[in-house]
Amino acid sequence: MRYLHFLLLFIILLFSCQTDKTNLSDKTLVSWITLHDINVDHGSILTIQHGNQFDGIVFGEIETGKWIAGSDHFIRTNQDMSNLVSETEESLGKMIQMAIVYEGNEIRLYRNGKLYSKHEAENIDLLSYENNSVSFGIRHVGGSGSISGDIEDARIYRQALTDKQLNDLKPNLASRIEPYAWWDFEGDEIIERTGRYINHIPGNVPNIKQEEGKLKIRKWGKLIAFGPQTPQTPEWPENPPDDWLSFHLAHPGPGIAEPGDPNPAYYYKGIYHLHYIYVSATGYAYGHLSSRDMIYWKWHTTTLVPAFTGHGMFSGTGFFTREGQPAMIYHGFGSGRNQLMFALDDNLDKWSEPIAINPVNDDGEEPDMSHWDPDCWLMGDTYYALSGGQDPDLMKSDDLENWKYMGKLLHEDYPGNLGVPREEDISCANMFKIGNKWMLLCISHKLGCRYFLGDFKDEKYLPDFHARMNWVNTNWEKNHGRLVYFAPESMLTADGRRVMWAWLINGGQPTGIQSLPRELELPQDGVLRIKPLTELQKLRYDEIVLSNISVKPENDFELKNVSGDAVELEITFSDPLPEEFGINLLGDDSGDNGISIVAGTERKTLGVADIEPPFELKEGEDLTLRIFVDKNLVEVFANDRQAAAHIHDHIRSYPNISIFTRDSELVVREVKAWKMKSIWK
């Protein structure tokens, strides 16, 4: 009998544990809204999110006028819209209750208490995390989307409500079931009634306000709510996954660095500082690293977060005031304005409150201009700033407080022979003096990283040269299976070198991979020099040197002694051939399907796998290639005049390097190879 009691107790406990585990993913989202526009798309009237995962009541994302259970990458979303009823013009001005019930592995949508749709999905727990967030307007934190309407009430329940329980709910009246979170939007300030979410950050403030007991959201308006925040300090794991890089900077988490733009960079009081964008629990934040040599970095606690600024930290640059104080200019995501902040301590951990930049015309009126990726620089004693986008705007100030609108950045004499129209968007901009020119380092969202060289005329920028640093057209897409060299940032080193980074978009993990730092120089011949950072030589060990190698067609020379998945090569070809020659490396498990780096004096390009950066050898000029292999990421530098990056499908512990020639015997003066240390150990 005692045995049966114990068995019964065990079964009850086991069933209870399993039920609790299942119920962790059960929840209900409810929101009452009066729509004002059905033509907005992929906005949410209530989203719960933790990290990159979210569930939300999303409108018009897949098909105009229809509701879905929005989720990260549509993992828990039914994308079949064929049987769903669409909102019409008749829906406008009428309050609608929309609800999503997550129960077990079933998701049910309700409109005004009646079943709208249902489907099966593997639901997840988003309510057990103290640092989750809730958003209105946008699809999710770090994303976009719009809603146009008045939200009367919004709630989250930690259980799957029944049809009757949903129908019993009334806006602005307490329910018998205690909500996990509840907004009734009454009073003068936004308050979440359970006290769970004590912080509320509005975005695009003119388009969102609490008024007359409603949250009134118009296109691009948004609200993010979150509780007390534990400061985040990114940290590289002690035992990272095998495919994580060894000597490239990247974001280890929390959150993801997509975008992962390198942003304000400084050399200040003996220390280098670099910021970059990542998506924190409450939106776009600036990760902060510091280093004494630009090789070994440490993370600071992330302080530039929406909880402090009131908006997301988006693309921007660092500069110094006339007095030598570090400052940053950036786009305040969701604020509709570009912003300025000033450092308040030597470690660059404390910053002033943001100051919105509001330029005026000569008549004191606000100009018709875009507010987008900015940059700021000094010319003489005057500060100039651009606001990016198509045909960017220009402004100037004597004090960083009062800004005069100057019209367009680009001079009306913009040349027609640069190979790129002036309307090609200029974002992630960085303007600086180099040699006897002014360089505008930037991106186009279509072309990736690029640069202009030129000068100022009539207080306008007049470029006379343009070139790309990326040769994969992005077409405004983030992840497309090919590495994109994107979003540059630069700074001056202690000894006056101009050093730049760029975000390498590849769609893999970890996110926020930064390119190797590159030194830029513009000598008297006017040709930009691009070199790997000198300090990278600190990482070399186990040197191998080979000299005077003869390579014949059909008989590749293999570098059999070069091993490891983190290596640097320096290969010099004497009197290079007009025909194609070069280097094969990497490949799959069998050594096939590798990548080739191809040169030749009759070629106009340097082939690096499937990209063709412009590159020509001068008559009688030797060719020196510096090649960095970090797992499956390859960066190539040719005669300090060209550089390219490529990511391969496979990682090999033996890099499978060989030198080839197509038609004639090739002389390789010298090969140097090194293994490379990890920057994380």
Task: Give the positions of each predicted feature.
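Extracellular glycan-interaction surfaces
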Residues: 30-39, 58-124, 140-141, 156, ...
